[in-house]
Amino acid sequence: MAEPLLELEDVTARYGPVTALHGISLRVDQGESVAVLGANGAGKTTTLRAVSGTVRRSGKIAFGGKSIARTAPEAVARAGIAHVPEGRGTLTELTVRENLRLGAYTRRDRKAVAGDERRVLSYFPQLAQRGSQRAGTLSGGEQQMLALARALMLRPRLLLLDEPSLGLAPLVVAEIFRIVRELNEREGLAVLVVEQNAVVALDATARAYVLEVGKVAVEGTSADLQRDEAVRRSYLGY
Amino acid sequence: MGRRALGIALWVAVVAVILVAYAFAPRLVSDFHSRDLAEAGIFFIAIVGLNLLTGYTGQISLGHGALMAVGGYTTAALMVHEHWRDVWTIPLAGLTAGVVGFLIGLPALRLSGLYLAMATFAFAVAMPSLLRKFSGLTGGGQGLRMLEDAPLQITGLSGTVTIFGHSMTQNHFLYYLAWGIGLVGFLIAWLIVRSRVGRTFRAVRDSEVAATSAGINLAWTKTFAFAISGVYAGVAGGLLATQNQIVNPLTFTFLLSIVLLVGTVVGGLGSLPGMVVGAFFVEYLPDVSTHVSTAPGVPDFVYGAAIIVVMILLPTGVGGLLKRVARPLTTRLYLRP
Amino acid sequence: MLLAFDWTQLAQQIVIGLASGGVWATLAVALVVIYRSTGVINFAQGEMAMFSTFIAWSLVHHGFSYWGAFFLTLAISFAGGVAIERAVIRPVERAPVLTVVIVTLGLFFVVNGAARWIWSPETRSLPNAFSTRPIDVAGVAFSISDLGTIAVSLGAVALLWVFFRFTKLGLASRAAAVNPEATRLVGVRVSWMLALGWGLAAAMGAVSGMLTAPALASFDQNLMQPILLYAFAGAVLGGIDSPLGAVIGSLLLGVLVNLLGTYVDWVGSELRLPVALAVILGVLLIRPAGLFGRPVEQRV
């Protein structure tokens, strides 16, 4: 079996005195798209933060075989992990174009960056029209797309997506997940997406983990989880 | 004996220690140093008030030195022009400064954060010029000299003060007066903080939007906080004038406002007990700095370095440290195992 | 009546006001850069600028030309600013804002004390950057020194603007100031962006100091204290989060203060600053975020 792209083993994470993850283990293989589901407070966002290094964590966290358990967020990004945070992290004072350019901060290949900007904008035509607009004036859906586009400018090997559906209308959510799926299938981009909206997430991913109170309660292929009535009712709310 | 009784016993012990310290401290130091202790008490009063405004209500003021000026000049003017006895001017000094504090609080309704700091800073910077301008009342650049123009109004000018049959030196008297008022002021502030008003202050500090949605009147709260901290500053200013027996524009420069803010933050925003340490810090640090060396610039360097080091080691002030230390103790006392 | 008014004098006083305002503007921009990145007003900015001016003096004293000393001082000041941020601000990066404010106050005394200790308290003078001859523009005599000061101030500010607007590092720096968490996630070392901000601010302060000193017959360690007050006032007037505002606010303030001093009798030199502050307060009460500041949006 090929080495997983991302591997977490017995990872704990805490916010000050409060422990949010109590030893979770998960993996994402090359080119795979995986969902992390669960109720509010289950530790989904914390899981992504543990990977990108924005929370105090311990345990084994390996990316491409190398440990990133002690790596600072800036270096994690440089290693090829793009984290689209909860709330999108839009740089509201900067223009759309500047947000994108910032995404490519770690890259040195200027020509390729320009090419990527065109390619990324082709996925998000709405953004292309708003190049010099201040990012703070975009709608919620557009900001989510911008956050995603900015992450892609990094040319990541793994994309961490935190609750992309939050606060967005169903049509917009569907559009975003369609794009995520396309990126995964067409470009082989590995995706780890955290979502409260289990329906949409399971449709767009191959495997899923369900978290409960900081631990992995259920794991399996998305198809299996969609079919499993018991799991759906107790963990996914439908 | 239950936990509750143990808690009460602890409080009684703490209060007893404080009162004993208050009563006997002057015996332990020379008469001259009682004066420094008194001045520490004066700072204590001012920064307790400033803490109510900045630490508990979240409003920044760079102008409390100017409020002390209002109090100090009220005292001096009453003594020199109206022949009031110095101690009796103190309440009025507080009141006048409270009113001015209220007026300063009015811009607070429109301005916040840095802009409020700017407004209070403008007041502090303008104060010496204003004092010089209205020389009829304030004695202009010369100031008012109570020693020359109102000697009969000075308590203890003869060197001894007799109260309730006890006689003591003038410096001791000033110490007892300052810290006596300080303890009373501390008690009042403590009661305010624990009361509904105190919760209102904290609500405004933590989130004005949330506070307004909860029905809190921001205008009233902010101006009240300014007014009450003004009263404290005014009382402190009046005491300072009483102690120095002179006031002039240089007594109350912008530097004083800074010193008060330093004392409050070092003591710990949102912590009243910490203010004791804050007061001693700003009172004694200049002396300590000069002790290190009197070469040009070195005292200032030491002074600034001490402030920086304290802030790096204790970012939430002494009060923050006290809270962190006391928390496990008090939690153990009040929670079931 | 219009013909009897002395337009020449007005024009001259405006230029003089712009020159003072220009000096304040460079320091004000320094304050804004630090405010945007660190969230505090650096009370030591003036003293750092003063220290830089003394370094310039030492260089000139050792044989450098004014402009040679000028640019070398800029480089040294930049390094100094970075060093100060790493040593003194970084440890309190996560502390409450007022704590950092107090640290900058401590820094004020540290830098001032250091300057007094290294250079004895006697007064010194810095040669003039520009000739002191007057120049004739459209029949009105202006001082080259004033015009040169305006040019250098605005030039420095413009260079800074170019840096922030058009370079990758400048972009990262701006982003770090707006949203440090998100900026970290794209690979920017946010902590170092802060240091960069302090370095640039120190360099701008140095410009301010080196333009202030030559205009005075002599200067000492108190050189920049009034300048800091005016710069702060100008920045607040323009809107503390807006560099453009800081520049325009300071220029306006410079002209206002000078015109008040010239034309209004009871505003002697005593009341110049308080009156200016009163005007600013008036403006703030109408526009609480300053002329160009963005009103703070409250997220409910």
Model-derived features with residue positions:
Chain A
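Glycine-rich phosphate-binding loops of nucleotide-dependent enzymes
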Residues: 2-238
